[in-house]
UniProtKB/Swiss-Prot annotation:
Intracellular or extracellular location(s): Membrane
Name by which UniProt lists this protein: Transmembrane protein 213R
Membrane topology category: Multi-pass membrane protein
Sequence intervals crossing the membrane: 33-50, 55-72
UniProt source species: Invertebrate iridescent virus 6
UniProt keyword terms in alphabetical order: Membrane, Transmembrane, Transmembrane helix
GO cellular component: membrane
Length: 522
């Protein structure tokens, strides 16, 4: 046993060694002496550079810390073993006989002695066999119990760990579909209802509202433009068996009657214009087919042929029939109006007699156009064209003045339709209707019917008028958004489920895989 003193107890121990860094082989007193030397040298260096306050501060604080630590602990000793005349002598003075030949391990019969306990281990008495290790000089019994270093090998007590006998899991490659592909063993829920087998057999389908209906390309319905494939139209869902999902028309896609050999089938069925409105989904070869269990809305127009029952002239009450209508392009100055198509009646309207005696505007002739605008079942609009009683200054009171026309004295200036006054240009009367107001068809005066709505002069398609297309577009946008969100949620849930199962089946553990026979790679 070697004992050291602190420099407080023995000043010579401070100058006996000039080590500045403590090591693990030093005793506590030697470590404190080394730390004190380091503090003293650091203080002297700071003092040489003019740092008097810092030097004094470090020196005082360091010495106080060393003294306090030393005063609170007991002196420590380094225990060891010495071989004296073939005997191991420990710090307690106990002796253990060992073999004199330490070149190789050997066993011998120890002398008879009573059993004693050292370090919690009871050593056998008598002539128990003793095994001597020539490396550590620590004798151990044949049973494996250590004499001087008890507890060092307790971690290996017992049989072999059974986990070491299990082969390491090696994940199959990503291309192994039999392992990674999803199966029918799926817990279905509102976000996980699709199976891979069904999708492989039936194709992709939308999952919104748990609907298994397949989504196929859009079936374009418009026939206004030549390029029908690029014409915008609303989405239609079709069944997955190659049959059109339309009421009244159930035939395969490939079937096109009266098709010339070598001719490409049309994208949609040709409409029988102008005999039927564009919303009638009937081809030439089908217009004579009698369809049972239907109610007639208009002559030749049935409920089963109408895609949307809220169209312009569809869905009328049975007791209020309307005449047949035709899509008409108005003419202005002998030229068709650009992008303007309206529905007109095939039957010519009756002439409306004028009411000139009561002061109303003259309507005593039949209109030039043989076709009339299609209007709602509303009273004829005499209101806008009814002559009003003038109250303007300079115009005789209650002079009939037409709507939109500028009343002026006769002969005030020569214009088309003006009446030439007698000599002297005297004002002999007032006339109306000199400034003609022309409608879309080039007629000199507006129609006698009310307009249906403010969108009546805009483009319409065969699905619905503009005022009905917009709500449908909004509803479709909401449906598509919800369907996209549902699909994304289901896709994300399936992805997270797959990742969780992969980590559970093949954990990311690569420790000692090469040592246990694995590849060492995940």
């Amino acid at each position: 046993m070697s004992k050291q003193k602190l420099w407080i107890d023995d000043l010579n121990s401070f100058f006996g060694d000039w080590s500045l860094i403590p090591t693990s082989k030093m005793t506590r007193e030697e470590k404190l002496n080394t730390i004190t030397r380091l503090i003293l040298i650091a203080s002297l260096v700071l003092l040489l550079f003019g740092k008097k306050d810092a030097s004094l501060y470090i020196l005082i604080i360091g010495l106080i810390i060393v003294i306090v630590i030393y005063s609170q602990e007991k002196p420590s000793t380094v225990e060891g073993f010495e071989i004296i005349n073939g005997e191991i002598v420990d710090d307690e003075g106990e002796k253990n006989e060992i073999a004199t030949n330490l070149g190789t391990p050997s066993s011998y019969q120890g002398g008879a002695s009573k059993g004693r306990t050292i370090g919690g281990v009871t050593l056998p008495g008598g002539r128990a066999p003793i095994y001597t290790c020539n490396v550590t000089y620590y004798p151990t019994t044949m049973s494996g119990n250590s004499v001087m270093i008890t507890g060092k090998n307790n971690a290996l007590v017992g049989p072999q760990n059974p986990k070491t006998l299990m082969p390491p899991p090696i994940a199959p490659p990503l291309g192994d579909l039999d392992t990674w592909k999803a199966s029918e063993w799926t817990t279905h829920s509102h976000v996980n209802s699709r199976t891979v087998q069904y999708e492989d057999e039936a194709g992709p389908f939308r999952t919104f509202n748990n609907n298994d209906e397949r989504v196929l390309p859009v079936n374009c319905l418009s026939s206004y433009e030549d390029d029908q494939a690029n014409n915008p139209c609303f989405r239609r869902y079709q069944s997955g068996i190659g049959i059109k999902n339309e009421i009244g028309i159930m035939e395969p896609f490939e079937h096109t009657p009266n098709l010339i050999k070598g001719e490409t089938p049309p994208l949609i069925k040709e409409l029988d214009e102008p005999y039927e409105p564009t919303f009638a989904r009937r081809a030439n070869d089908e217009k004579d087919i009698i369809e049972p269990f239907i109610s007639e809305l208009q002559p030749g127009i049935y409920s089963s042929n109408i895609d949307q029952p809220i169209l312009d002239n569809a869905g009328l009450l049975p007791d209020m029939p309307q005449p047949q209508t035709t899509l008409f392009t108005p003419m202005i100055n002998g030229k068709p109006r650009d992008k303007m198509q309206i529905y007109v009646e095939d039957k010519e309207a009756d002439a409306i007699p004028g009411i000139t005696d009561s002061g109303y505007h003259t309507l005593d002739r039949a209109y030039d156009l043989p076709q009339r605008y299609v209007r709602e079942r509303l009273p004829k609009r005499y209101g806008e064209w009814r002559a009003r009683r003038s109250t303007m200054p300079g115009i005789p009171f209650e002079t009939p003045v037409g709507y939109g026309s500028g009343a002026r004295p006769i002969g005030s200036f020569p214009t088309e339709g003006a009446v030439v006054s007698p000599p002297g240009n005297a004002c002999t009367g007032w006339v109306t209707g000199i400034e003609n107001v022309r409608d879309l068809s080039g007629q000199s005066e507006m129609s006698e019917y009310y307009n249906k709505n403010k969108l009546d002069m805009f483009d319409v398609d065969e699905n619905a008028p503009l005022y009905a297309i917009n709500p449908d577009a909004v509803k479709m946008h909401i449906d598509v958004t919800n369907r996209f969100r549902s699909d994304m949620q289901e896709s994300l849930m399936r992805k997270r489920n797959a990742e969780a199962w992969q980590r559970k089946m093949y954990p990311l553990d690569t420790n000692h895989r090469r040592m246990l026979g694995g590849t060492g790679q995940f």
